[in-house]
A protein has these predicted regions:
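Short beta-strand elements that form the blades of beta-propeller/WD-repeat-like
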Residues: 1, 57-69, 110-118, 164, ...
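Extended, non-transmembrane interaction/recognition domains
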Residues: 1-25
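Surface-exposed loop and turn segments in beta-propeller and other repeat-based domains
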Residues: 17-39, 92-96, 141-158, 208-214
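Beta-strand-rich domains and repeat architectures in extracellular enzymes and scaffolds
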Residues: 39-66
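Repeated scaffold domains used in trafficking and secretory/extracellular systems
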Residues: 45-51, 97-104, 147-168, 211-214
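Structural motif
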Residues: 69-75, 121-127, 186-191
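Asp-box/BNR beta-propeller loop motif
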Residues: 77-89, 127-140, 192-203
Length: 215
């Protein structure tokens, strides 16, 4: 039965996942509903799939098809009937790269982002799609245009290339911002924005979310 136990830390290192085929339809329906009600993407803790709905019926799901040594390999599926039926639309959205899905987000039926983090948490790559997930391309940020680094960068002897972890884009009107940090959990780094849905990115300064230091 289901027990209320705290997930052991090693779960992060060697994820055990249950293939979707073995999970009940009720469970799947429940997860889809949670994803529909969620503002962002929803991660199924049982099987590691990541689901996102742009509206009630139209959604996407990254499903784990293989896993090894803390990394997963995903395919991308789409529903147009609110999660009742799913169609595989992309067998390899991350172009052969394994990792842990960081997020999945669409802004209309065609334009969206997906993120794939390395198991160590030291790097993450954001991918963009303009055709509803049929193909993705990696976002390239112009690191050499960073004219300042975050407040503690000099103490840590960081250069721009030390910021390898791209956080999922934040939307503000027609502008999307990617914060770039040194590793998962860091509260400061540098950021880049795009006004053309991720085709070109511009350096937008350093940031620190550690309270009022240097703000």
């Amino acid at each position: 039965g289901m027990e209320d136990t705290i997930t052991p830390v090693r779960y992060m290192m060697e994820p055990q996942y249950t293939p979707l085929s073995e999970l009940s339809e009720e469970h799947e329906a429940e997860q889809s509903l949670e994803a529909q009600l969620s503002d962002g993407w929803h991660v199924d803790q049982n099987n590691g799939s990541v689901e996102f709905y742009v509206e009630k019926n139209l959604g996407w799901r990254l499903e784990i098809v293989d896993a090894a040594a803390g990394s997963r390999f995903y395919d991308l599926n789409q529903t147009t009937d609110g999660g009742k039926t799913w169609t595989k639309i992309n067998e390899d959205p991350f172009d052969g790269t394994m990792g842990v899905a960081e997020g999945l987000e669409f802004f209309d039926s065609q334009f969206g982002f997906a993120g794939l983090a390395g198991a160590s948490g030291a790097h993450s790559q954001i991918y963009v799609t303009y055709n509803g997930g049929a193909t993705f391309e990696p976002v390239t940020l112009p690191l050499d245009s960073a004219t300042e680094l975050s407040p503690y960068a000099s103490e840590l002897h960081f250069s721009a290339s030390d910021y390898q972890y791209m956080m999922m884009p934040e939307k503000d009107g027609d502008t999307y911002k990617i914060k770039l940090i040194n590793q998962v959990g860091e509260q400061e780094g540098i950021c880049f924005t795009t006004e053309d849905q991720g085709k070109t990115w511009t350096f937008a300064g350093a940031f620190s979310d550690y309270g009022n230091d240097g703000e």
